[in-house]
Amino acid sequence: MAENQYYGTGRRKSSAARVFIKPGSGNIVINQRSLEQYFGRETARMVVRQPLELVDMVGKFDLYITVKGGGISGQAGAIRHGITRALMEYDESLRGELRKAGFVTRDARQVERKKVGLRKARRRPQFSKR
């Protein structure tokens, strides 16, 4: 592995992201595509940039990311979690600031399973009194 390269794994819903950061000019590559090409929605791009903006390191690192599984929102959250972990590996003193913003904690919420006899996880069939 290259010198001064830092790694973080992020997960959210059913997505998993592997994030490699190394000093550079602020290039973000996700699955061999740029951030703008990969995420069409501006909100997803903002979520990915959040940890870097919080610690003022937007133009200081090049990010190489591979992400699998889930949808746009889950992948963006997984990438954010991975970037946060990689930044903490780079500099442990950033942990407090990142934790205060809520980026360190893995969001454990998962999709609730559909139950037998119900239409969805909790939605019951319509009740008819007569």
UniProtKB/Swiss-Prot annotation:
The keyword Secreted does not apply. Gene3D superfamilies: 3.30.230.10. Keywords: Ribonucleoprotein, Ribosomal protein. GO terms for cellular component: cytosolic small ribosomal subunit. One of its GO terms (molecular function) is RNA binding. PROSITE patterns: RIBOSOMAL_S9. Pfam families: Ribosomal_S9. The keyword Metal-binding does not apply. GO terms for biological process: translation. Belongs to the universal ribosomal protein uS9 family. PANTHER family: RIBOSOMAL PROTEIN S9, SMALL RIBOSOMAL SUBUNIT PROTEIN US9M. This is Small ribosomal subunit protein uS9.
